[in-house]
Amino acid sequence: MIRGLFVGRFQPVHKGHIKALEFVFSQVDEVIIGIGSAQASHTLKNPFTTGERMEMLIRAIEEAGFKKRYYLVPLPDINFNAIWVPYVESMVPKFHVVFTGNSLVAQLFRERGYKVVVQPMFRKDILSATEIRRRMIAGEPWEDLVPKSVVEYIKEIKGVERLRNLATNLESSEKELQAPIRIPEF
């Protein structure tokens, strides 16, 4: 049995992810889907929680009709590239092949001896979570870029409103981050 690894942030899950997963599912018996930056949420780059991203994936995979077994595994960032692959190995079941469109991820796994399949990217110009988040904030159409089940879920959790609030509060948030930390005197 061949098990593949596919890692993404899925902020949000979009049709490009589903096309990539269609390719991955066609190549292996089981798929481990690693949810990167699992510790991050409620920021412009990572607006959705890990649980919300898992729900999006479950719904989108069901909608796509993929029948093979898959595992969803949260992968918090460690920000240390040299040990990232051993870290991933410790967090997921054994796998045989890695699917990625990210050149750094490909290099790191190749250096550890893994077979890496650089998967085709599908309409990267618009099928990008960054572009989808930008459209959500700007009030531009985004719904055609994500599976219907994900559109419904984002509406259920008021995800667009969350993003717009984050964008509106960005200036004050940035000022707070730049303010000096005051240590209380005793």
Curated annotation (Swiss-Prot):
Protein name: Nicotinamide-nucleotide adenylyltransferase
GO biological process: NAD biosynthetic process
Presence of keyword DNA-binding: no
Family: Belongs to the archaeal NMN adenylyltransferase family.
Location of the protein in the cell: Cytoplasm
Pathway: Cofactor biosynthesis; NAD(+) biosynthesis; NAD(+) from nicotinamide D-ribonucleotide: step 1/1
Major location category of this protein: cytoplasm
SUPFAM superfamilies assigned to the protein according to its UniProt record, in alphabetical order: Nucleotidylyl transferase
GO molecular function: ATP binding; nicotinamide-nucleotide adenylyltransferase activity
Keywords, comma-separated and alphabetical: ATP-binding, Cytoplasm, NAD, Nucleotide-binding, Nucleotidyltransferase, Pyridine nucleotide biosynthesis, Transferase
UniProt GO cellular component terms: cytoplasm
EC number: 2.7.7.1
Reactions catalysed, as given in the entry: beta-nicotinamide D-ribonucleotide + ATP + H(+) = diphosphate + NAD(+)
